């Protein structure tokens, strides 16, 4: 895709991201009331991280830095999964304590008794958004050195030639 085509398509996506950012700011404003409890602190941290990731994503999209876009997308999806974990947890406060204390939630269970491992959380969120698993798996290729790194360096040229771009 040529830069002009890319920029035209990108403008619509950036507009959507900016709308999502506004919604996130509005959510955070609604969370913060006269009193703050642990839930409020957790959800404010989740929303703030979401906003900051959107703010980082937009310039990376404009620069066509797909490696960073993929990594930021994956982090955003992890943020979503951890936030969702608080809603399905057997003990929401335990999830919130783990996240605020910086400890993994993988030993905690959801209301059905399942350990909240990343794979399980991914599958649970995919029940809400059917493409979540596919996007998560593809974005993971940017986090780990994989075929994504190879295909980003290869550029097709004329006469059945390929070029390597770094």
Predicted regions and their residues:
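Charged, low-complexity surface segments at secondary-structure and domain boundaries
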Residues: 1-4, 117-123, 164-165
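N-terminal, Lys/Arg-enriched amphipathic/low-complexity engagement segments
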Residues: 1-46
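Residue-identity detector for glutamine
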Residues: 16-18, 76, 152, 165
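Short non-catalytic regulatory patches outside canonical folded cores
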Residues: 29-41, 55-58, 62-66, 71-137, ...
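Helix-boundary capping/turn motifs
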Residues: 46-52
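Charge-enriched, short contiguous segments at helix-coil
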Residues: 142-166
């Amino acid at each position: 895709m040529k830069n002009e085509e890319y920029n035209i398509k990108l403008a619509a996506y950036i507009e959507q991201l900016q709308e999502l950012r506004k919604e996130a700011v509005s959510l955070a404003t609604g969370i913060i009331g006269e009193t703050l409890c642990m839930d409020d602190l957790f959800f404010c941290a989740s929303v703030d991280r979401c906003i900051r990731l959107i703010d980082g994503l937009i310039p990376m999209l404009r620069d066509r830095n797909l490696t960073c876009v993929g990594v930021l997308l994956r982090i955003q999806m992890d943020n979503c999964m951890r936030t969702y974990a608080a809603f399905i947890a057997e003990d929401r406060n335990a999830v919130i304590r783990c996240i605020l204390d910086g400890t993994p939630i993988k030993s905690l269970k959801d209301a059905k008794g399942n350990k909240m491992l990343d794979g399980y959380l991914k599958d649970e969120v995919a029940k809400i958004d059917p493409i979540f698993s596919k996007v998560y798996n593809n974005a993971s290729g940017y986090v780990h050195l994989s075929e994504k790194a190879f295909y980003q360096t290869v550029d097709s040229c004329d006469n059945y030639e390929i070029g390597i771009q770094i």
